């Protein structure tokens, strides 16, 4: 496996203790998978912040949003025979699944792309309504014709789907509800229309026939989506054998639309790879990396809340046109940064 990422020497850039909890009595357990954008001359991250109550001995407790958008705390005895708690992220109690944390989205910004702080007078984004009672996660940001499109994972006991909000000033948001129903996530909208049409990558999942594959859809307005095509599947015996999912908005190059994506194997190791779509018809994938371009190797990527993970859904293409700076979640606990050469990634692609 070839790792071509140039990690920031300052990593991790953000840790759970760098940001205060949203509510008294909660603690931040994880900072994850930021969306990335530029605004007012600064680099901004919209970070997923996962919180839970401070834990008591022999008790598992976790927060849930009510339909009236208040937080309620559920407590379960660890010895309860109806509790299944084999995964740090999800538990099952009396046949129902619950997340062990509640996530919202927090804005931070930086003048240098390395040192981030919370600006004043910019709101956090939180779950709203019955489709987001378990929170909102993993926001991707696309800037299209002066408007920012925010796609994120909406989670509730109804399932996991894709929500959309739009903004021009990051203080006022228009809510468009759930644009892709359960079970779906990893939605990345292209930052340019192709032949007058919006396109987006997304990842529906099937528990029976099919799998965790990357699909593409089109839209006349960026809100209502259809014309779905499955374009990237898992590969048996390789690093992305269990699941694949889109990263951030595809990068336009002379050779095609370049997408940096995540893949995981049966051991739940998450790495990054890349594939290339046709410039005029992105439903056609024309090349893909065989090996990953980034593998969890640093200590902060291997050890954490859920270790052995690198996961990105945000990047910036630098002015030189070749350097792409990604911001990524490491071991489901830290926010980090790394740089790639677009030309080097393109050189590793194999035609399909």
Task: Label every PLM stretch briefly.
Residues 1-134, 142-188, 192-242, 251-305, ...:
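Beta-rich carbohydrate-recognition and catalytic domains
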Residues 139:
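Active-site lining segments of carbohydrate-active enzymes
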Residues 313, 317:
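C-terminal substrate/ligand-recognition segments
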């Amino acid at each position: 496996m070839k790792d071509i990422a140039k990690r920031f020497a300052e990593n991790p850039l953000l840790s759970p203790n760098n940001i205060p909890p949203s509510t008294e009595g909660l603690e931040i357990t994880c900072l994850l998978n930021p969306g990335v954008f530029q605004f007012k001359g600064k680099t901004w991250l919209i970070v997923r912040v996962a919180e839970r109550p401070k834990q008591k001995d022999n008790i598992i407790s976790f927060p849930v949003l009510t339909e009236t958008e208040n937080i309620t705390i559920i407590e379960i005895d660890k010895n309860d025979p109806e509790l299944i708690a084999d995964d740090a992220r999800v538990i099952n109690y009396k046949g129902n699944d619950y997340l062990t944390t509640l996530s919202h989205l927090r804005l931070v910004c930086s003048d240098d792309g390395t040192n981030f702080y919370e600006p004043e007078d910019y709101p956090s984004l939180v779950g709203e309504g019955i489709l987001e009672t378990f929170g909102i996660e993993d926001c991707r940001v696309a800037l299209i014709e002066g408007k920012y499109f925010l796609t994120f994972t909406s989670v509730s006991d109804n399932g996991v789907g894709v929500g959309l909000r739009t903004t021009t000033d990051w203080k006022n948001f228009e809510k468009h509800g759930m644009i892709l129903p359960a079970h779906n996530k990893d939605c990345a909208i292209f930052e340019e229309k192709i032949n007058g049409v919006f396109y987006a990558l997304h990842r529906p999942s099937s528990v029976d026939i099919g799998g965790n594959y990357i699909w593409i859809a089109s839209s006349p307005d960026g809100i209502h989506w259809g014309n779905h095509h499955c374009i990237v599947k898992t590969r048996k015996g390789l690093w992305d054998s269990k699941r694949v999912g889109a990263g951030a908005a595809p990068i336009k190059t002379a050779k095609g639309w370049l997408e940096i994506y995540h893949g995981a194997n049966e051991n739940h190791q998450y790495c990054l790879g890349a594939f290339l779509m046709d410039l005029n018809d992105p439903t056609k994938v024309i090349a893909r990396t065989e090996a990953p371009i980034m593998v969890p190797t640093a200590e902060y990527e291997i050890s954490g809340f859920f270790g052995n993970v690198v996961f990105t859904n945000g990047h910036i293409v630098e002015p030189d046109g070749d350097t792409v700076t990604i911001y990524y979640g490491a071991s489901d606990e830290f926010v980090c940064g790394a740089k790639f050469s677009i030309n080097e990634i393109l050189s590793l692609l194999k035609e399909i």
